[in-house]
């Protein structure tokens, strides 16, 4: 038996989400149609609203409903610090620490030549213009500690240092509450190398 075309279209639409394969998409579609049609309608309205109202901040490239986001509009922030992150989710995580009071630039990705993602796709030119505005003194590279994130940080760091900017990288190490017995050797090694005086 062939499933209705409307259901097939829903399954295919759900597959655009990261980590959602054909089986998961089919389960989600059937759940929404069988048990939560109201939720399905709310999901559809929310997706439509988001695509119509969200845009990229003109300064930092994060998602916003205005031309300039809330963080970039905040006069209390330190404009001499610019933290570079891969995604808006990374920015939110840093904000939740309440330890950073500078500004941001969101790359919306990371360098991955095998996937066709180069400097243009991560808005490299915009970042360089922003960092070279004469106000920024330090660029904090907060890309993830994956191979692509490290390559991105290296590429950005070399280019920004050549422009006379101070470039720093987030430290790596043992997580808060972590026990050495359960931490991988690479993390422990990095924590040992990045140790500081007390």
From Swiss-Prot:
A zinc finger (C4-type) spans 57-72. GO terms for molecular function: DNA binding; zinc ion binding. It comes from the Bacteria. Keywords: DNA damage, DNA recombination, DNA repair, Metal-binding, Zinc, Zinc-finger. The keyword DNA damage applies. GO terms for biological process: DNA recombination; DNA repair. Residues 80-175 form the Toprim domain. Pfam families: RecR_C, RecR_HhH, RecR_ZnF, Toprim_4. PROSITE patterns: RECR, TOPRIM. HAMAP family: RecR. Belongs to the RecR family. May play a role in DNA repair. It seems to be involved in an RecBC-independent recombinational process of DNA repair. It may act with RecF and RecO. This is Recombination protein RecR.
């Amino acid at each position: 038996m062939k499933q209705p075309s409307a259901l097939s279209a829903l399954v295919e639409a759900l597959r655009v989400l990261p980590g959602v394969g054909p089986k998961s998409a089919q389960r989600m579609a059937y759940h929404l149609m069988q048990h939560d049609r109201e939720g399905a309608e709310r999901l559809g309205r929310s997706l439509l609203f988001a695509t119509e109202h969200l845009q990229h901040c003109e300064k930092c490239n994060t998602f916003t409903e205005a031309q300039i986001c809330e963080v970039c509009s905040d006069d209390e922030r330190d404009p001499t610090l610019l933290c570079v992150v891969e995604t808006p989710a990374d920015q939110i995580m840093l904000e939740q620490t309440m330890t950073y009071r500078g500004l941001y630039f969101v790359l919306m990705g990371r360098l991955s030549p095998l996937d066709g993602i180069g400097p243009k796709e991560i808005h490299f030119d915009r970042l360089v213009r922003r960092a070279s505005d004469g106000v920024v003194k330090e660029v904090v590279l907060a890309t993830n500690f994956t191979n692509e994130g490290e390559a991105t940080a290296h590429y950005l760091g070399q280019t920004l240092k050549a422009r006379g900017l101070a470039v720093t990288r987030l430290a790596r190490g043992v997580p808060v509450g972590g026990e050495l017995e359960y931490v991988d050797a690479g993390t422990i090694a990095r924590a040992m190398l990045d140790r500081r005086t007390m």
